[in-house]
Amino acid sequence: NRKPAYGVAYTKAGYERVIRDLEKLGGTFSEEKLLASIKVYNRHNAAMRKVDEVLAKHPEITAAQRSDIFKSSFFMTKEEHTELVEALIEKLEAQTPAAEKLPIVISGILTDAPALNAILDEMGLHIVADDVAAQSRQYRTDAPERDDALNALAEKFANMDNCSVLYNQDKPRVKW
């Protein structure tokens, strides 16, 4: 189990082993760079949580567009994606939402299925929330910002919940 102190220590030890293996290939690990990266990723997480909230209020954003907003984060730096998402949030918050559609919540691992998104859009459905690993679920938990970056990452992993691929003996459910 990843949550108790021994689970956090085990996760950190795994990270340290990967670092040693990578350093054998060349380069060196930098605590300072990892700490800076945690700040970048936490800011990106916050922007993605905010855009998720804003998209719930804007039925004019199609399922396909929503999917693209989340998917695009895999293809650019987090800094660049954060800036684009923050600009989108600003524009959406400044405009009046379109007429309501039938709200739905989606769940799963992946929903980047153009045919499924087309059906959702054709049926006039509006995704108001998701529990999708490739969408908002990955942004729920930030790494603590402090001096020990590897412990922060291990604690982030320990604090992640409500994901079918992460063991949790209590099996909690998402609270809407």
Tell where the protein language model's regions lie, with residue ranges.
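A short, acidic, amphipathic alpha-helical segment used as a generic capping/interface helix at domain edges
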Residues: 165-176
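A charged, amphipathic alpha-helical module
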Residues: 12, 16-145
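Short, amphipathic alpha-helical "lid/cap" segments that border enzyme active or binding sites
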Residues: 8, 12-15, 174
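Short, charged, low-complexity loops and linkers
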Residues: 1-2, 30
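Alpha-helix capping/termination and helix-coil
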Residues: 124-127, 157-165
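Acidic, Ser/Thr-rich peripheral helices and adjacent loops at domain boundaries
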Residues: 145-159
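A short, charged helix-loop
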Residues: 2-6, 17-20
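Hydrophobic structural segments
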Residues: 6-8, 160
